[in-house]
Amino acid sequence: MLGKKEFLEALRDSPVIAAVKNPEGLQNCLTSDCSIAFVLYGDMLNIAGIVAQLKEAGKLAFVHIDLVDGLTSQDVVVDFIAKNTCADGIISTKHSLVRHAKGCGLLTVQRFFVLDSMALFNIGRQLATAEADAVEILPGVMPKVIRKISGSTDKPIIAGGLISDKEDVINALAAGAVSVSST
C-alpha cells in the first residue's frame, strides 16, 4: 500500500493530475504521462474495473466517492472501495468519510469549494482538524485564494476546476498549489 510520503512525492513529481470524468477521459489518461488519476465517474458495478485499468497502466488511482453512482455518503462506501477495488485512495467533500478512509488505510483528498468569503473562512476552520493527506480547492483558478489557504496549512494543496491552459497551471503552482487536477 502506498504511504503518505510516497503520495506527496508523486504529487510533487507529477504536478498535473488527470481528472477522469468519462470513458474517453479514461482512455486518454491511460496513455498520458500523468502518474495520478482522480476518477470522477462510474458506478458501483464498474468502478473496480476503472480503477484496475488505471493500476495496470501504472497510475495512482483516487476515487471521488461522492460522484460514484449507486453509492451513498456512508462509511460502508469507503469499506466497499477499500475491499473491492485496488484504489490508492478516495476523494470526498465529507470529513467523516475522509476520517473513515484513513482508518481503512486509504490515502485521502478532501475537496473544498470556495464559493464566497464565508466558505473560505470555514475552510480555514475545517483544515485545523482535517485528517486528509491533501486538500483540493475548487475552482483552482484563484491564485490569491490558493496562496491564502496554502499559507494556513501544512497539507499539500491541489487546485482543481476550471483549469484550462498552461497559464492556469503555472499560476496555481506559483500560488502554492503542489499539483493541479484537470481534464
Model-predicted regions and their roles:
Residues 1-65, 69-71, 86:
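Conserved N-terminal beta1-alpha1 strand-loop-helix module at the mouth
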Residues 17, 38, 62, 91, ...:
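Conserved beta-strand positions in the central sheet of alpha/beta enzyme cores
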Residues 19-30, 74-80, 118-126, 165-169:
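Short, acidic/polar
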Residues 19-23, 67-72, 91-95, 113-116, ...:
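Glycine-rich beta-to-alpha transition loops that act as phosphate-gripper elements at the mouths
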Residues 29, 94, 135, 172:
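Conserved, mostly hydrophobic/aromatic
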Residues 39-43, 97, 139-145, 161-183:
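Glycine-rich phosphate-binding active-site loops on the catalytic face of alpha/beta enzymes
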Residues 73-97:
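Ordered, amphipathic secondary-structure segments that act as subunit-interaction surfaces
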Residues 95-126:
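Histidine/lysine/aspartate-rich catalytic loop segments that bind and position anionic ligands
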